[in-house]
Amino acid sequence: IGQKTALVTGAAGFIGSHICHRLISDGYSVVGIDNLSSGKLSNIPAGFDLRNADLRDPIVREIVVEIQPDVVLHLAAQMSVAVSAREPLLDADINVVGTLNLLEGVRAIEDKNVKFVHFSSGGTVYGEPTCLPADEAAPVHPLSPYAASKLAVETYLPIYERLCGLDHSVIRLGNVYGPRQDPHGEAGVVAIFAKAMLGKSPLKIFGDGTDERDY
């Protein structure tokens, strides 16, 4: 059995880079796609096969067909809720159209069952959860364009299963934290609080302090 190949989108980002390091240590041949709009080259190993491309570029389909991956781990996204509210067309273009571009590349591969893992939006697809903790069967009620675009991709995956037999999984991560996380973002609450504490800055908590951050 030959070496397996993994394609990771958003490979230079916080989570994507950790996945790349793990896959390499597990013996995979790894190719990454990232336009470096938020990812950093310093996050990935020297000599790593990184293709600088936007998810919406036609070349993404060519890369998928070229490398014939055994598994695609899809993390690249427009990830700001605030940006999605200001520019919902941009958000949908990147998160929905960009993902469809990637899926069409997978669909073009013949005689190979590619595993597709979509890293979705975490808890935002639930909106205001009706029960806590929310599990996979909990009702979804997106309240932002970002949440709607990520949920839209989730609904496309079973369609691609019918179209081309796509083997797919969806992962909704909540409150991920760790090394290489950007402490300046809007959602990395652990990194933001840690940076404030290290800098002896006040922690800003909105509301009455009873809000629950995770799901």
Residue ranges and their predicted role:
Residues E128-L132, T155-Y215:
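NAD(P)-dependent short-chain dehydrogenase/reductase
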Residues I1-V176:
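N-terminal Rossmann-like NAD(P)+-binding domain of SDR-like oxidoreductases, especially those catalyzing
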